[in-house]
């Protein structure tokens, strides 16, 4: 059973089609990251799965429960941290989390200790005396995701969980999301930050213009770019031109260029398999390898490869 499954899912806003027949699945117990620019359909998909929006057509299920015909049951087994932090303006963080814990059915005897621990984990404890309206943007966002760490649902939705949060805060939230997954929750994260996607994802689905373009692990997505790995070599041997010719014949090589007499640059697929073969070949040709530097494709490169545009450009 999939934790999430959509079939031919569409959502129409007037003349704009946000989702265009989306077929999408999430395995139980994984972190699935939706990577795409603003307007790609990420938030629309999340809001449908959270039962906030109804699809125009198609079906969507969470833990085999239909989000339209059994929406109450879906809300009982899932939780959502929204893109924009939500809270009662004149309430304090503990009051907001206490209210959330109550409506989620967390026993009264467990609430206070759980809320205190989550607030300390997210470095919100020192802000416990502030009103929501006086929290900084980063504090408000951490409070929004804190709701799910208090609730700990079977299916957790995070819409851009670290927007407005500094790097230290991002890492704290990422670690807590991993912890939630390790405890058995299935997690769906929407983001346009490649570093966040790479850090969190068990698998990534690239969304563009309401469609799923590709879905796989980070490693396989990067390996799918032919010649995407760049290997820079410093060598010492009798004939650099000859070694360029020989390296060009190795399996996985797309192109080898001599930068100067001793420095080569190779564009290869799957550098982790190519480098050992390269060193063995150089040894056979009496050429010493003095240094090796490998640069792999970024997720922005992956997005560019599959959509024809840069994620950074598409997001602006």
What are these regions (language model features)?
Residues 131-135:
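Conserved ABC ATPase signature
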Residues 156-159:
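Catalytic Walker B motif of ABC-type/P-loop ATPase nucleotide-binding domains
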């Amino acid at each position: 059973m999939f934790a999430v499954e959509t079939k031919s899912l569409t959502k129409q806003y007037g003349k704009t089609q946000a989702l265009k027949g989306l077929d999408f699945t999430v395995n139980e117990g994984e972190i699935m990251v939706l990577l795409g620019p603003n307007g790609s359909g990420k938030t629309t998909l999340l809001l449908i799965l959270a039962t906030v929006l109804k699809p125009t057509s198609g079906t969507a299920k969470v833990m085999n429960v239909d989000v339209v015909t059994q929406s109450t049951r879906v809300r009982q087994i899932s939780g959502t941290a929204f893109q924009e932090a939500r809270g009662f303006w004149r309430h304090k963080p503990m009051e907001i989390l206490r209210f959330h814990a109550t409506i989620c059915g967390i026993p009264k005897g467990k609430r206070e200790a759980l809320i205190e621990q989550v607030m300390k984990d997210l470095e919100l404890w020192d802000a416990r005396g502030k009103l929501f309206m006086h929290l900084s943007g980063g504090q408000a966002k951490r409070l929004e995701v804190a709701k799910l760490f208090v609730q700990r649902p079977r299916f957790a939705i995070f819409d851009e969980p670290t927007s407005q949060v500094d790097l230290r805060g991002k890492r704290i939230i990422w670690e807590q999301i991993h912890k939630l997954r390790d405890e058995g929750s299935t997690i769906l994260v929407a983001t346009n930050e490649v570093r966040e996607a790479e850090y969190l994802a068990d698998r990534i689905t690239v969304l563009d213009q309401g469609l799923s373009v590709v879905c796989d692990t980070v490693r396989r997505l990067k390996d799918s770019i032919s010649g995407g790995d760049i290997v820079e070599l410093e060598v010492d041997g009798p004939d650099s031109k000859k070694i360029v010719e020989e390296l060009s014949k190795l399996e996985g090589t797309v192109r080898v260029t001599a930068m100067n007499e001793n420095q080569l640059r190779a564009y290869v697929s799957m550098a982790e398999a190519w480098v050992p073969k390269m060193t063995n070949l150089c040894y056979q040709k009496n050429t010493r390898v003095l240094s090796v530097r490998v640069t792999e494709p970024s997720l922005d490169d992956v997005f560019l490869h599959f959509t024809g545009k840069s994620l950074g450009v598409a997001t602006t």
